[in-house]
A protein has these predicted regions:
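Cytochrome P450
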Residues: 1-417
Length: 417
């Protein structure tokens, strides 16, 4: 998506492929809000302090609906259907209410046995010793399998689905992104039609059978209950893509941080009850979502002392906020015993990540079972040589080559022979 251009010259360049945290620190030292231009986007305002980010995420004058952008007719990007991420109350409230119960902590607890079974199946396919890529062999297929099972995506279609999804969230080119958007739209349209004709117990079938009547006019109001066809398409797209992309990054980034800090890995092995804390610290320290979706000023407003024009794009940096020293002492230190309350890894406010309980459960299970199976883990290459998939909004490892020790319990010791 191309964001609208502010009325004054750009003052900063934002390169997501570079070291983002050094760039965020430099910007924070200058102030909470900056004009930036990132590759593939137009000019926008970037919010980088914890206080200002929290304020922006709850400011009703900053809207998610692209139609509040000064250039909304040409800057729609490759959105598929209408979804929660690009809507505002009351539409957002209604859409979120329709699926919130399916991602509540109690519902996710019921999925934990299946998550553990999938994780164990994947671990059994990894070599007993030697090297492997943790992303392709474990961090990716675990959340893909889980969300596809929840929504009812057939096994045979999952590889293609992920290829399209990956191209949309981290595009290699405008043409490739457009092609993936078209392919995924066609696929989801056919899948929804199939779920409507032959409902099963999947979430997508449940949503499909509550679709509203497109001939009834505009969006039904809160409490109407149904989804319009375009909303159902957007909901399927958002749940499938958001339901796995960030979790892949979370699992791999958490292990990366642990391997880069051997003292923390040793502490976790000695006390597995810290696994949840390790995931929370990873969300703060190396957030898989570096920025929330673009917001657009519905009217002129003041944000942390900066004047924002109507129609201007605002980008809130969750990653920068979670490294703010005013909110987190010694923020560049990875500490799994930290209690990082207030981290913004899953956002804040009305658009706080609906799938947070699912992502937390998947990451915690993935980490616990991996460490339990392998008493020795180490980088298989120089960490400095690892490449990160980056976009304005997301950041995650492309691959994570590891050296594996012999599978066994926690009493096993020693590196691979």
């Amino acid at each position: 998506m191309r964001a609208p251009a502010p009325k004054e010259p750009v003052t900063e360049d934002l390169d997501p492929a570079a070291d983002p945290y050094a760039a965020y620190a430099a910007l924070r030292a200058k102030g909470p809000v900056h004009r930036v231009r990132a590759p593939g986007t137009g000019d926008s305002w970037l919010v980088v302090t914890h206080e200002a980010v929290r304020a922006a995420l709850t400011d009703p004058r900053l809207r998610n609906d692209i139609r509040h952008s000064a250039n909304w007719e040409t800057d729609g990007g490759h959105a598929i259907g209408r979804n929660m991420l690009q809507s505002d109350p009351p539409q957002h409230t209604r859409l979120r209410r329709l699926v919130a119960g399916h991602f509540a902590p109690g519902r996710i607890a019921g999925l934990r046995p299946r998550m553990e079974a999938v994780a164990r199946e994947l671990l059994a396919q990894l070599p007993e010793r030697g090297t492997t890529d943790l992303v392709s062999g474990y961090a990716l297929p675990l959340p893909v399998t889980v969300i596809c099972e929840v929504l009812g995506v057939p096994v045979a279609d999952r590889a293609a689905f992920h290829t399209w999804s990956n191209e949309l969230v981290m595009p290699t080119s405008e043409e490739a992104a457009a092609g993936s958007a078209g392919a995924l739209t066609g696929y989801l349209t056919e899948l929804i039609a199939e779920k409507t004709r032959s409902p099963d117990d999947s979430l997508l079938a449940t949503l499909a059978t509550t679709t509203g009547d497109a001939s009834a006019g505009p969006l039904p109001g809160p409490g109407a209950g149904g989804l319009m066809p375009e909303e159902l398409l957007g909901m399927a797209f958002l749940l499938l893509v958001a339901g796995h992309e960030t979790t892949v990054n979370l699992i791999s980034a958490t292990l990366h941080s642990l391997l880069a800090h051997p003292d923390q890995l040793a502490r976790l092995r000695a006390d597995p009850s810290l696994t949840g804390g390790a995931v929370e610290e990873s969300l703060r320290y190396n957030s898989p979502v570096h920025a929330g979706a673009f917001r657009f000023a519905a009217e002129p407003l003041d944000l942390a002392g900066t004047r924002i024009g109507a129609g201007d794009a605002v980008l809130v940096s969750l990653a920068a906020a979670s490294r703010d020293p005013l909110a987190f002492p010694d923020p560049d230190r990875f500490d799994i015993t930290r209690r990082p309350r207030g981290h913004l890894g899953f956002g804040h406010g009305p658009h706080h990540c609906l799938g947070a309980p699912l992502a937390r459960a998947e990451a915690t299970i993935a980490l616990r079972l991996l460490l339990d199976r392998y008493p020795f883990l180490a980088f298989a290459t120089d960490p400095a040589d690892l490449t990160w998939r980056t976009s304005t909004l997301l950041r995650g490892l492309r691959e994570l080559p590891l050296r594996l020790g012999r599978p066994g319990g926690r009493d096993s010791r020693g590196p691979p022979a």
